């Protein structure tokens, strides 16, 4: 986030908000949460916002709660197919809920918790610059000819070690299917693995749009933001959600699209065995691959950011 915001006219403020987890943080929560609320109060008094936009997460709770006490309207945004704990708590204090995935479970929970809340299916905002890439740019970055299918494994800036290990363990089989682009995550490259048709990089920012445009099949985690961007791209996609014990919402995000036959979903515990066969099936024909991408594209909401911005502006003017 820090790298993404660098150079943009957005003021970033840190707040020491506690997480409601186990261990020492749970013991200290009764002490730390009031301090976080006091910190939030000072920030809100200084900035005097007309409206507060909360995306969920532990940082949003003290700010939104104090904002409600100060009679500032709270607008929530829920990215995922199931509502997070912070947003569930903040519903009763909020005026408007924007939902990224139009799931009945999210809507019903909002209605049951707060009968006065207004609900709008806005979609999830995307980085529109990701849609500006080209095949020529991808060829330039990777050195690939583009004559073979392009397989992209994209674990995000933090990387996904399970994805990395599966790629390294089945690289020979993947290279039988096409050229492989592997974004490992910061500091997770294996520099001793080299091949003319294997492009390995930890993180790409400026050139990421070209890599995405160049890819025929993309393998990714199932975070809501990634899914929104992949839907906008309309690429054939394989999702590998985090296990339920880590993040249940990724499983739900992926399941929602799997039911619609818009993505292929693989379990990370058996990824080494299933990754290559899944990609082989997608690449079985151009029609098969394109239809999968087209079905995912039907879930794209390219103007999600504008929809949310309009709600914020309308609320602020009231």
Q: How does the language model describe each region?
A:
Residues 288-302:
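A short, well-ordered alpha-helix in the C-terminal region of glycosyltransferases
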Residues 50-51, 213-228, 235-236:
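Acidic donor-binding loop of glycosyltransferase active sites
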Residues 1-32, 39, 121-124, 267-269:
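Conserved nucleotide-sugar phosphate-binding/catalytic loop shared by glycosyltransferases and other
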Residues 10, 72-73, 216-217, 234-242, ...:
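Structural loop-to-beta junction motif characteristic of Rossmann-like glycosyltransferase folds
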Residues 11, 68-136:
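Active-site-proximal region of nucleotide-activated glycan assembly enzymes
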Residues 2, 7-8, 135-220, 250-254, ...:
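Donor-nucleotide binding loops and adjacent catalytic segments primarily
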Residues 301-318:
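C-terminal alpha-helical cap of glycosyltransferases
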Residues 4, 38-53, 59-75, 88-96:
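Glycosyltransferases and closely related glycan-assembly transferases
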């Amino acid at each position: 986030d820090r790298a993404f915001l660098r150079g943009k006219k957005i003021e970033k403020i840190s707040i020491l908000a506690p997480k409601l987890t186990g261990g020492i943080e749970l013991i200290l929560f009764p002490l730390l949460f009031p301090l976080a609320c006091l910190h939030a109060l000072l920030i809100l008094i200084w900035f005097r916002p007309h409206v507060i936009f909360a995306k969920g997460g532990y940082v949003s709770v003290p700010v939104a709660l104090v904002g409600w006490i100060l009679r500032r309207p709270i607008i929530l945004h829920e990215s995922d197919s199931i509502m997070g704990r912070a947003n569930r708590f903040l519903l009763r204090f909020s005026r408007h809920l924007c939902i990224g995935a139009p799931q009945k479970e999210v809507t019903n929970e909002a209605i049951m918790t707060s009968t006065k809340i207004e609900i709008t299916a806005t979609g999830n905002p995307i980085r529109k610059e990701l849609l500006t890439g080209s095949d020529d740019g991808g060829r330039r970055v990777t050195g690939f000819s583009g004559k073979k299918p392009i397989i992209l494994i994209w674990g995000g800036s933090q990387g996904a070690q399970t994805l990395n290990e599966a790629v390294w363990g089945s690289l020979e089989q993947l290279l039988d299917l096409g050229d492989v682009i592997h974004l490992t995550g910061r500091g997770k490259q294996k520099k001793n693995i080299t091949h003319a048709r294997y492009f390995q990089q930890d993180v790409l920012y400026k050139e990421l749009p070209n890599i995405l445009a160049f890819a025929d099949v993309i393998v990714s985690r199932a975070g809501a933001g990634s899914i929104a961007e992949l839907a906008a791209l309309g690429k054939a996609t394989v999702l590998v959600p985090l296990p339920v014990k880590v993040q249940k919402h990724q499983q739900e995000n992926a399941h929602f699209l799997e039911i619609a036959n818009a993505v292929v979903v693989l379990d990370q515990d058996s990824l080494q065995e299933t990754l290559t066969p899944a990609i082989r099936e997608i690449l079985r024909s151009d029609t098969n691959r394109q239809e999968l991408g087209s079905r995912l594209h039907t879930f794209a909401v390219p103007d999600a950011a504008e929809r949310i911005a309009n709600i914020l502006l309308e609320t602020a003017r009231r």
